[in-house]
Amino acid sequence: MEDNCTDMFNGCSKFDISIQTQVALLALIDNTGYTMVQVNGQRKFGGPPPGWEGPPPPRGCEVFVGKIPRDMYEDKLVPLFARAGKIYEFRLMMEFSGENRGYAFVMYTNKEEALLAIRMLNNYEICQGKFIGVCVSLDNCRLFIGSIPQEKRKEEILEEMKKVTEGVMDVIVYPSATDKTKNRGFAFVMYESHRAAAMARRKLIPGPFQLWGHTIKVAWASPEKEVDEETMQKVKVLYVRNLMMSTTEETIKAEFNRYKPGVVERVKKIRDYAFVHFFRRDYAIAAMSVMNGRLIDGARIEVTLAKPVNKEAAWRQNGNGHMNANSECLLNFANKEGSQKALDMCSNVPAYLNNPNSPTFLEPETCTYPCIPGTKLTPINLYSLKIHHFHSAVMHLEYFCYKNNWSFPEYYLYSTTGQDGKMLLAYKVILPAITGNTNSYFMPDKLCSFVEDAKELAAQFTLMHLDYSYHPTSGKNISLPSTAATSGTSGVLPYTPKPYSYSSYPSSPNVSLTNGGSVGKQLYVSNQASYFSG
């Protein structure tokens, strides 16, 4: 007991911890028999609990708690969360001042209790006018490895990663969208545990690390979204990967209808992957077993059940530890040892551009505050900001290029005349770092009435092809796992932009927009030097 007290209040003279709080925490330890220690900016209660034998609980037993009042501690929080089940470990993030940082992680002894805690305590009014947010927290066991030679096969990459790191379970390698004999220049390495992944990252990151004579890039990969079994039992949409770029939706529908005609409701194809919607779940399950590994237009496809979106309200971790609505799809938390936690929090997210079935975009948050006379303002570098400080797709794309040490995107403006005689606009985006001297570019297939909207749409379209993939369960439900997905983007750092909002503009007619022809170049805009040309 005395040792526990020493660890728990180690350096307590530096903290403004009230005597009443100390007494309450000591009483909690005495009543429960749990240990409590403070280390690396977090206070750990339990882990393991008294009398525990065997390994820690499996992945999926931990929940994240946000919007905790700063002056609330374990003496109030632990009894509350114990209502859902036996707590294996409670970790409260702490400030140096002694206040908590507004969030915590609670690990239960099984997944059922963790899910019950979410149902019971998400949006729970913990004190008058204060509501906490609770959602699933997942240990990240995957690393992103970039700048891999594109001719290397999965077996070679797996063998090499096992040589240089321990605990490797598998590697995920995607073929190029344009050449199926090559990989995309990156892979995801699966480890047996979060600790194994963290140790591997620590070994690979400090300095330039080479494989096959190439300096590789290493980063945490966004963990795969986990969906509860009850929800997955309702899914009747298949996710089909590794298609040829030239394969059409009609071909895919015909192939999946072959085993039983008329079972496919619709198909949505995006670059080299597609979503196949079935009229019934049993049709989808049967088709998955029959079609997985089959050849379509010479490409061997991978078929899995699409993962639906979590429809509950999402929360976002701010710098002060509080959570707000309208969040990114996934939130990542790194502790001082470089380990990472990812929270599975999907909510309203952007659909495929201008899909008639897409949901309404979220309105941007109100972020204006009064500037009181005498307020001290400090000059800062634009790229020292965090991702949540950017809202527009144009800024996200520029930030994305900066993070990958690429030159900034180049925007080329095109125009055409609509059926009503109105001028319509579209931008073509060129990324010199990945297109080189080729004619490759990114250009949306929709036109806008206003130049600002056209540029924003082009930037989002480019980001989608660099880093987005979509997993709808219907035309109105879509999620965004972070997966680099473009041929020629080897070594791209994983990056998940937030959803964007646009002002309303009239829907454009289906005008053929090509590079040249009847659509003339009107304007070139560079992020570094703007000039006009005829």
From Swiss-Prot:
Transmembrane stretches, start-end: none
Highest taxon, organism lineage: Eukaryota
GO CC annotations on file: cytoplasm
Keywords assigned: Cytoplasm, Differentiation, Meiosis, Oogenesis, Repeat, RNA-binding, Spermatogenesis
Keyword Chloroplast recorded: no
Xref: NCBIfam families: hnRNP-R-Q
Protein name, per record: Probable RNA-binding protein 46
Gene: rbm46
